[in-house]
């Protein structure tokens, strides 16, 4: 049986580019959420349902669709799911009311599976000692897509309107859908592919949650981290574009652009986790995150000072994700996609909670309530990271 070939360096980075483009779609809404709310005549709490339902649909899509990656070609599945994303974007672009816009966003979320197929695909095609580094490259692509989406959406919406943002996104998705067949390997069936039928794959998730309980802890940690990430950027957009601060959506985009420089440090944190072990590294990263996020409230009314906690959060947030993924991507190859399914479902459930909480807290308590809630979630993440280290140590070894 033909073995999957090792990824070249160029392929690793092209996969990261693909991950960036397909991930970005869900995050264009963040800097323009105020503009969209005003266009449709709704308040902050109601518009918060758009990203919340997107995140819930993403969790459902991952639960139902991602396990197929353990049985069928990742290449074929990725292309099919990107076509589905194109459909959701077109609905959002043409929507004349909030209901149809929300339907398109929800459809988009359901098919946003490619960023989570790609790490499992890559993990079977890299040497074990490079797993942390390559996982970090793909994670950097995801985070870069999220951050650049905010920059582009904020600036484009300020000068050309929010619909133009989604027309551009549709064009990018069509381009990446056409490019994927040349990036991903064709015609090799993985020797470790599961022989379980589809319903068996879904049912096996319960057995994995029972037998591989650490993935639940890693998923909870990332769910908290991702939820606070979403709450921060939604609350920040409402705060900066509201009457108290009075900035345009382009300023939110520029701030996201500044934060995007942090993505270049992510591969370094992955290599560090390769050396000292992912669980120990995660404890350290979570402590740094608490220190950074504690500055949100005192610096909240000064745009320049706000850059400090935002930069710190954007440096260590992806690093925590990388270390959490490393705790299960080192497991048996035939289990990795399903373990990823459990992890990502928990992550996006956290994102849905963060979407609702970020907008509702801002409407009820302003920036103070939002900043304090995010700090509390950071503290809980830090505690769970320490618990995970105490329970599991770093049993899968540093490799260097």
Regions found by a protein language model. Name each.
Residues 2-6, 185-219:
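Juxtamembrane intracellular "pre-TM" segments in multi-pass secondary transporters
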Residues 114-126, 319-332:
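Intracellular juxtamembrane helix-capping segments at the cytosolic ends
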Residues 60-98:
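Conserved MFS/SLC helix-loop-helix module at the cytosolic interface between two early adjacent transmembrane helices
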Residues 137-182:
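Helix-loop-helix hairpin linking two adjacent transmembrane segments in secondary transporters
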Residues 279-324:
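C-terminal transmembrane helical hairpin of 12-TM major facilitator-type secondary transporters
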Residues 77-90, 280-295, 375:
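Structural signature of the two symmetry-related core transmembrane helices
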Residues 62-73, 264-278, 362:
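Helix-to-loop junctions at the C-terminal end of transmembrane segments
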